[in-house]
Amino acid sequence: MITCASCTLAAVLGGLVLSAACGGATQSPTQPAQPGAAAAQARTFDVVIANGRVVDGTGAPWFRADVGITADRIIAIGNLSGARASTRIDATGQVVAPGFIDLLGQSEFNVLVDSRAASKITQGITTEITGEGVSIAPVDDRMMADRKASYDFFKIAQDWRTLDEYFARLAKSSSTVNVGTFVGSGGLRDYVMGKEDRVATADEVAKMKVLVAEAMVHGALGLSSSLQYVPNRFSTTDELVELAKVAAEHGGIYITHQRSEGNRVFESVDEVLTIAERADIPTEIWHLKTAYKANWGKMTEVLRRIEAARARGLRVSANIYPYDRASNGLDACLPVWVREGGTDAMLKRLQEPDTRARAKRDMDDPNAPFENQWYGSGGAAGVMLSSVLDPALRKYEGMTFEAIGKAMGKDPRDAVIDLVIADKAESSVIISIMRESDVVEAMRTPWVSFDTDSGARAEDGPLSASKSHPRAWGTFTRVLGKYVREDGVLTLEEAVRKMTSQAAIRVGITDRGLVRPGMMADLVVFDPATVADVATFEQPNRYSIGMRHVLVNGKSVVANGAITAERPGRPLRGAGYRDSR
């Protein structure tokens, strides 16, 4: 029996690691051989999941078996009908699979507000990967002041400065999910340069490299960027290569919200590939898409370019969410130049009549030299207000800006600007920018995994007040229900592989993502006939259905479809982590 978690993933998957890199599929025996079967029958487990259809995460066909768990690990798989167990879960007619890994969650703050991570665990997510561009740490007093409104609203004390201190806080607070994070290069620019929206000097890049090294030692999974937005949009390719080299030295990866998902998507993908090659680092593209109607159909060429890079040895892959609408901050509907210098500078700038007039003109400019989300979404009819921080503004949630403009008696563009000011840039919107067939084409690609690009929400409590994109509630169950069971886009085994072992490999997690002895006991039990998302754009705040049991580190966080009081989630630190305590 394999007991070394660090060797388990490589030993069990064997060729899968290679095949994932090459875009192939690997089959394992229908019923894996388990040494010591007789001994397993006679022993006592903390939990036995009995009579389930095991989809083990390798992509191999399902097999019927029991799964025995002791403490936080899977100990045995096979016929355990004679074994004793403190808890026995009857999985007859159910699928037993590894817990799902969300390659872009946004819950590093949310789990401190509500430790249930309710909308995530009810869709089977047991691990969240966070840190898009601007990460939770490192921060200084000035950066903390910028985030004060949200922290004060939720009554959360920001008592960390470094990533190590954040992980310590996370471990102390505990939640239902495991959380790993990247160090955001946009946040590093803010830390070193303040609100200076310009190219970094050599000295500033050197300081950022020191911070990357520190974050990697503290447990960051690698380096991230969010190049469509301030301050990361001022990062040059050379700057990113230098920072990524440091992450690579510590065993990390580079992961990016690329510079353009729209009119310059080809050039943007080429930049990602350049960084991967020059820094010699595994690379992942977050929420791959070809946005705005003018770019629909370009997914084929985007995938071809990445596939060609993979064929010549670059370790590049991507993830998506299974929806044709995106979500963003309301301020992202404004021209980029309006947002330069940070939130305070933007809010002050928008008070000026000349600035407002120019911003409104640029919002309707089809040739604007930036990702024009307002125009690309079709303007007022294609942008829906999804959430606000100020309770007085919640009457507008779920309305398009066409409707909001009418309700306010003003130009919808003025409504956007006024709401940005009134809610201090804390509002979010849903934008109609993608085509279903492009999403499906990416989904079918073997090396594409999944993400929610959302923080955890809940039907009650402090995270229930605002609406959000339905992906926060149903990304993974939507894949299983719509795209596996109903549409047949993916087989069940392939979908689970993408959600589990492939995702784990991409971010360097070695002890999760498979149903195998020695692996951590992050497991889901769901009904393949009923599992589904029920969240919609109009009524998003609804938990998924069909997810019967969810275990994290051997503890049940969902039992018989209900959230429990267990909070076994842990910080997940990357390969470069060194414990200095």
What are these regions (language model features)?
Residues 52, 67, 72, 93, ...:
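Divalent metal-coordination and catalytic microenvironments
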Residues 6-21:
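Bacterial N-terminal signal peptides
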Residues 33-45, 54, 58-99, 114:
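Histidine-rich, glycine-flanked metal-binding segment
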Residues 23-25:
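Bacterial signal peptide processing site
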Residues 91-96, 100-105, 111-221, 310, ...:
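Divalent-metal coordination cores built from histidine and acidic residues
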Residues 52, 352, 441-448, 453, ...:
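C-terminal cap of metal-dependent C-N hydrolases
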Residues 167-170, 175-202, 206-230, 240, ...:
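Active-site neighborhoods of metal-dependent hydrolases
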Residues 54-66, 427-434, 438-439, 487-497, ...:
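Acidic, glycine-enriched loop/beta-strand segments at the rims
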